[in-house]
């Protein structure tokens, strides 16, 4: 089992979800917690174009693609960095990756 943490940005997004979307995300996070680094496609995949080893947790809720950008910290904890609804957003990764990288850099600087 892997410990899963969430950043303030992820938690803010999560708290704004509908109950159905939140349940779908919790199921996906449960898979990540159980499988850790071994969680692969279709539930998780690497994000190209990042300076870090960012990954995305791929969740479907009512046919909509919800995505959670995450990474493993030096202690091998999965850190949920941010989330978003990719529905109709052709530029999702163009904004999500740079934002996640900035949050991740700050997380690493502040981590004990």
Listing of model-derived features with the role each one plays in the protein:
Residues 1-65, 74-78, 85-112:
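Basic, Lys/Arg-enriched alpha-helical interface segments
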